[in-house]
């Protein structure tokens, strides 16, 4: 996105960072507000319908992004894209209700791994297309891939309920936020998803900016894409491994280990002066944080009954979208001042997540009220 902003006429590095943050935040900001609404509609009328809505919107809006002529138009297109977002939490909800209870983390891990693999392949493929055919062509290719996914979804997917029968429309009562918050540790899971996504999206913005500031490096797009892709592969491995370990090791313990190890490594990226060092550190961070979203959603699946997971995962996705929206804004503002400072901030956020997990997980509500008073 920073490279496209520059192509659209923004040349000042500080303004590139700021616009990149605003554009990256636009879609999740809208999606975060509407995600719970679509989650409740999915529980009531079927998750397949919501998945179709999301992909169909992506096909049109992403193609339009390849046609914009100003950074303001791109920002508006990203806002409109938020009206069709919510694909990932719906896919997570489908996976959580389709798998046996003891295999829910593995099912969620598979969905998350597919998403991470798209992050791995996307920047490298997008960098190649952008280098040889222009950045606009990358948007058209992405829209075409979404169209293929839409056809496959319509033709091949049959939605089932947790009992294994077809989902009757209009069968589920809506789950409101105040009801979701009554589930033990629901708010903590929401916070962990926010933190995990905040860190991931922040690094996705910082890597291209960091590489662009490295002296003597010309292939900025290709190098940035390679670093992001390799880190995403590491995160995919971590997600799969964490999902399988969760069948024998408590999920909060796995999350704690990842956050405590990944925080200092994230801050250490501030010391990277060349792309090889940045690549190694980003890969290690991916190994530590790759399973965070998977494990947090698996915790959510343990907390919420299957018939309400569409709405519940919509509310949990609010944490993801808030993290996705606020991270580019915060990281863009910090990077405009100091890129190393932004890395350190991400590392501190990871340690805050570990502290929240250590203090709040499993504590009775009465004990928490006593601790606050």
What residue spans do the PLM features occupy?
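Structural signature of the two symmetry-related core transmembrane helices
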Residues: 49-64, 143, 253-267
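Short amphipathic helix-loop junctions that connect adjacent transmembrane helices
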Residues: 1-17, 205-222
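Juxtamembrane intracellular "pre-TM" segments in multi-pass secondary transporters
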Residues: 158-189, 373
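Symmetry-related core transmembrane helices of the 12-TM Major Facilitator Superfamily/SLC fold
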Residues: 137-155, 342-359
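Conserved MFS/SLC helix-loop-helix module at the cytosolic interface between two early adjacent transmembrane helices
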Residues: 32-69, 246-249
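Cytoplasmic helix-loop-helix junction between adjacent transmembrane helices
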Residues: 77-116, 299
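Pair of pore-lining "gating" transmembrane helices in MFS-fold secondary transporters
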Residues: 1-3, 7, 183-200, 283
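Residue-level signature of mid-helix packing/kink "hotspots" within the transmembrane helices
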Residues: 28-36, 86, 119-120, 232-240, ...
């Amino acid at each position: 996105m920073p490279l496209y902003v520059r192509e659209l006429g923004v040349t000042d590095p500080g303004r590139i960072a700021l616009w990149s943050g605003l554009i990256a935040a636009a879609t999740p900001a809208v999606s975060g507000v509407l995600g719970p609404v679509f989650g409740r509609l999915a529980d009531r009328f079927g998750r397949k319908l919501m998945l179709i809505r999301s992909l169909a919107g992506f096909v049109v809006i992403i193609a339009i992004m390849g046609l914009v002529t100003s950074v303001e138009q791109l920002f508006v297109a990203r806002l409109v894209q938020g009206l069709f977002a919510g694909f990932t939490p719906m896919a997570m909800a489908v996976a959580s209700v389709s798998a046996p209870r003891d295999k829910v983390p593995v099912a969620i891990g598979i969905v998350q791994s597919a998403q991470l693999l798209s992050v791995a392949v996307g920047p490298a493929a997008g960098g190649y297309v952008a280098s040889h055919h222009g950045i606009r062509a990358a948007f058209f290719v992405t829209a075409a891939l979404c169209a293929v996914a839409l056809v496959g979804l319509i033709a091949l997917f049959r939605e089932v309920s947790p009992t294994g029968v077809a989902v009757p429309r209009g069968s589920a009562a809506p789950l409101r936020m105040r009801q979701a918050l009554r589930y033990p540790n629901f708010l903590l899971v929401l916070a962990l998803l926010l933190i995990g996504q905040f860190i991931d999206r922040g690094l996705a913005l910082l890597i291209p900016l960091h590489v662009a500031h490295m002296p003597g490096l010309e292939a900025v797009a290709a190098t940035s894409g390679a670093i992001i892709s390799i880190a995403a592969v590491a995160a995919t491995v971590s997600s799969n491994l964490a999902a399988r370990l969760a069948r024998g090791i408590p999920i909060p313990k796995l999350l704690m280990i990842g956050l405590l190890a990944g925080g200092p490594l994230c801050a250490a990226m501030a010391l990277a002066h060349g792309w090889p060092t940045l690549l190694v550190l980003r890969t290690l961070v991916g190994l530590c944080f790759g399973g965070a979203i998977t494990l947090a959603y698996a915790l959510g699946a343990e907390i919420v009954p299957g018939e309400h997971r569409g709405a519940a995962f919509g509310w949990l996705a609010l944490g993801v979208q808030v993290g996705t929206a606020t991270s580019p804004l915060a990281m863009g503002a910090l990077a405009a001042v100091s890129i190393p400072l932004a890395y350190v901030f991400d590392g501190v956020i990871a340690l805050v997540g570990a502290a929240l997990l250590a203090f709040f997980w499993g504590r009775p509500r009465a004990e928490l009220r006593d601790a606050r008073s």
